[in-house]
Amino acid sequence: MAIVGIDKLSLLDYEDKVSVVLFSQACNMRCPFCHNGAAVLGASKEDELDFDEILAFLKTRTGLVDAVVFSGGEPTMLEDLKVKIKAVRDLGFLIKLDTNGTNPELLEELLDEGLLDYVAMDIKNCPNLYAETCGLKFINVDNIKKSISLLINKAPDYEFRTTLVKEFHERMDYDAFKELIKGAKRLFLQKFVDREGCIKKGLHEVDVVEASKLRDYLSGFIPEVNLRGY
């Protein structure tokens, strides 16, 4: 696995920070609504970026950029993710990790070694709809729960985020979802947009009225629940 994409300037991926975003190759999920279909379904060898060249570019951004975001795909599938994060961190950048939470062991290592400043974890759905929402026949929800607990208890700062898609979330069990993220401090409910790059075409957003109902319900248990993109 390798880095296959770079956004050299982002004002959106790390709140209140100017960042560079690195996109890793491949993912262990197949969420039909994923916008990064090319990376998820596997970029070719020709798409791989030389990491030394990435570091050389980042050196020219010191003082201009606050942070580097490791995104994907699923970056915890990178065998040398820790090495790459350390190399970037040594240049003085903050580190944000975007993850689906399927690798709690590596996540805990990164947190325990103080290598992460912010983590954004996708919470796909309530447990009984999790695998379906991820485009899988089975998923180990226990690993998802472990990662949720790690962020709540160990992350310097974090957010959970759920992209609302009508085909998957109009059947969501609100109570089961609430229990899944019990103890969280921050959740973003994100608007789905059917755009070029999605793995499956023709899916639909959850309208703002229904999204607001879910936000209002969860606000009774989570200090910060916000709509994003609505």
Q: Where do the protein language model's features map onto the residues?
A:
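Conserved alpha-helical substructure of the radical SAM core
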Residues: 37-68
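Conserved AdoMet/S-adenosylmethionine-binding subsite of the radical SAM
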Residues: 55-67, 76-207
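SEC14/CRAL-TRIO lipid-binding/transfer domains and related phosphoinositide-recognition modules
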Residues: 3, 7, 26, 39-40, ...
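A C-terminal junction/extension of Radical SAM enzymes
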Residues: 212-230
